A protein has these predicted regions:
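Extended helical coiled-coil dimerization/tether regions that scaffold
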Residues: 93, 170-284
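P-loop NTPase switch/coupling surface
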Residues: 1-183, 200-204, 214-217, 221
Length: 284
């Protein structure tokens, strides 16, 4: 998936704004309050259209609170009026096809339209049908990591058992501002128990652990790094040998904010890749 261009109208601080993105990397620079996060949130809503066709995932729409507010002098008071329609239009490529799609919210009581996004939803609908039939299409990783992920944790709306991890669950909460570490820990728990039962570590679990361990080793310089899921505490533990050659073991949640945030993002990316495409085994 590649977003080449996005055009937004009456979305938060923007009455009208258009942005183009480089195919490799786009860096957005601006003063505080100029709308950098707003632009990224608009992109996440556009990308969220892809998720609307997947079972148990749901899409991401435009909220009435996203509407631009205009100020009008009314005698001795200043009145705020939300502006509609709120519109987000994007163009790019998905599964080898060049597509354009648009989402709109026409009123505070309305719902985000999807009628102008059929090019996008038809692709995701076909992917969902193939998954349902047991086929193995390669699903793209989608994730959004906002500035509040370190402090905000997603509150689970339902009790998801260990057996629930079908492929599309790799898209659950992938565009939320708050992280869902509980779901990630449930995946580690399931795979750890499964590995213990079979007597061998699942290749995809080994690959995810290796990604986290390599990240921790590269930013700290510590050696013999291992990642283990603690079945007693239900936490991810980092085991390593420090500069004094002493063996240490700490829960990932107890690390400094910088380490924790970095490792959490790497872990989230890696485990979602394993959930979305488990048939790739160690190549996830």
């Amino acid at each position: 998936m590649q977003i080449d261009r996005i055009e937004i109208e009456n979305f938060r601080c923007f009455e009208h704004f258009t942005a183009k993105f480089h195919k490799e990397l786009t860096v957005i620079v601006g003063n505080n309050g100029c709308g950098k996060s707003t632009l990224l949130d608009a992109v996440s809503i556009a990308i969220g259209t892809f998720l609307t066709s997947f079972d148990d995932v749901g899409g991401y729409g435009i909220s009435k609170d996203d509407a631009l507010n205009k100020c009008y002098d009314m005698g001795s008071v200043v009145e705020l009026q939300p502006q509609f329609p709120v519109a987000i239009e994007a163009s790019g490529s998905l599964c080898g096809q060049q597509i354009t799609w648009k989402r709109e919210l026409h009123s505070a009581e309305g719902r985000t339209t999807i009628v102008d996004a059929k090019e996008m939803t038809s692709i995701s609908s076909k992917l969902q049908s193939r998954i349902r039939n047991g086929e193995k299409p390669l699903l793209p990783l989608i994730s959004y990591y906002g500035t509040g992920r370190l402090w905000a944790q997603k509150r689970e709306k339902r009790n998801m058992g260990l057996a629930k991890f079908n492929r599309q669950m790799g898209y659950m909460d992938c565009l939320e501002a708050a992280s869902n570490e509980k779901m990630m820990r449930k995946w580690f728990e399931k795979m750890t128990i499964q590995s213990a039962s079979s007597g061998k570590v699942a290749p995809e679990l080994m690959a995810v652990k290796s990604a986290i361990a390599q990240c921790f080793q590269s930013i700290t310089g510590y050696q013999d790094v291992e990642v283990q899921f603690n079945l007693d505490t239900h936490e991810l533990d980092i085991v390593y040998r420090d500069n004094d050659l002493e063996h240490r073991r700490y829960p990932m949640k107890s690390l400094s904010d910088g380490y924790k945030n970095t490792l959490s993002m790497v872990a989230d990316i890696a485990y979602r890749m394993a959930v979305l495409n488990p048939w790739l085994l160690e190549n996830v």
